[in-house]
């Protein structure tokens, strides 16, 4: 019985230690811009993290790109939302130019035009370097998002 009691005590102690470590990590992993968590929901609102959406595109159909960017523009997210659209040296830039102009008028959108095609990953990196959000969301230029996607992050 001594071995069973010792094993049980070690198991319970290990669980308690792991729970404490997990809760400590969760506390320190919160974004620095987030307000402290409150037990009373009426006391204060927790600050929402800022979100940067990265949209790399290359030779995308103008209608498809427009639908994608419109779906991002219509997000119901209450926090700060910035959108970085990266044109990766598209050959059809004259066709997607009007789409870029429409969304460039929205202060949440930033259009980045790369001189030549460098590939999707490097296009994403170009946008990430200029981003400052707490969270980064990568979206393909042929994707249409539901209005609550960023909120559900």
Swiss-Prot record:
One of its GO terms (cellular component) is plasma membrane. Gene3D superfamilies: Spore Coat Polysaccharide Biosynthesis Protein SpsA, Chain A (3.90.550.10). Its EC number is 2.4.1.-. The keyword Protease does not apply. Keywords: Cell membrane, Glycosyltransferase, Membrane, Nodulation, Transferase. InterPro entries: Glyco_trans_2-like, Nucleotide-diphossugar_trans. GO terms for molecular function: glycosyltransferase activity. It is found in: Cell membrane. It is a peripheral membrane protein. Involved in the synthesis of Nod factor, a sulfated N-acyl-beta-1,4-tetrasaccharide of N-acetylglucosamine which initiates a series of events in the host plant species leading eventually to nodulation. Belongs to the NodC/HAS family. This is N-acetylglucosaminyltransferase. The gene is nodC.
């Amino acid at each position: 019985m001594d071995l069973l009691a010792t094993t049980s005590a070690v198991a319970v102690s290990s669980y308690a230690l792991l729970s404490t470590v997990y809760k400590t990590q969760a506390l320190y992993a919160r974004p620095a811009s987030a307000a402290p968590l409150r037990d009373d929901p009426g006391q204060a609102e927790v600050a929402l993290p800022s979100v940067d959406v990265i949209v790399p595109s290359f030779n995308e159909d103008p209608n498809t790109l427009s639908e994608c960017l419109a779906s991002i523009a219509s997000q119901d997210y209450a926090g700060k939302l910035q959108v970085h659209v990266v044109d990766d040296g598209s050959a059809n830039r004259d066709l997607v130019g009007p789409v870029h102009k429409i969304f460039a008028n929205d202060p949440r959108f930033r259009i980045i035009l790369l001189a030549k095609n460098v590939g999707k990953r490097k296009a994403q990196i170009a946008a990430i370097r200029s981003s400052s959000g707490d969270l980064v969301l990568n979206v393909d230029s042929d994707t249409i998002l539901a209005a609550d996607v960023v909120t559900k992050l």
